[in-house]
Amino acid sequence: MSRILAVAVLGFLCSACSVTRKIPEGQYLLQKVTIESDKSTPRKERITAADLEKYVRQTPNKRFLGTNFYVWLYEQANPGKQNWWNNWKRKIGQEPVLLDMSLTERSAQNLKVYMDTRGFFSSQATFEVDTTSRRRRAKVVYRTRQGEPYRIDSISYDFQDKFLEQIILPDTANTLIRPGRVFD
């Protein structure tokens, strides 16, 4: 009997600490963002997920021991009181990051633009949002297809000024642009 009571009390306390309690109806706490790349591009030429993460506009809150401790701490602060304890909670805590579909779409566009600038002109970036969780949490998965990178076929120079030709042509051995390299 005491075990059942202990489990019930623990369950009650955990539900009282829910960070999604104050989230408005129809909104979702951004829980996780992942980037998945297809494996069709060779590994040494593939853009890593770590490079792509910089272009995602929304990132989830920090976690502590698998919990949203920082969001919980932020929500425990009383906005009506201005004392050092509430100020400390607001300073250490983090405001909850809510899913914003316009930022999610913009992030997919940013990923596509970045892959284009790296020479992957036939790339694609899509996203999928999972809001099926009963606790008003959202997970976003970005899927990228990089394809084959474009390569530099040949290099030719067309000089109108002979003076510039005498300066540039002897220095072409030091150029970083070479035939066969990825157009980046």
Whereabouts are the PLM-identified features?
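Sec-dependent signal peptide recognition
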Residues: 2-7
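Interaction-mediating elements
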Residues: 18-184
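C-terminal motif of bacterial Sec signal peptides marking the signal peptidase cleavage site
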Residues: 13-16
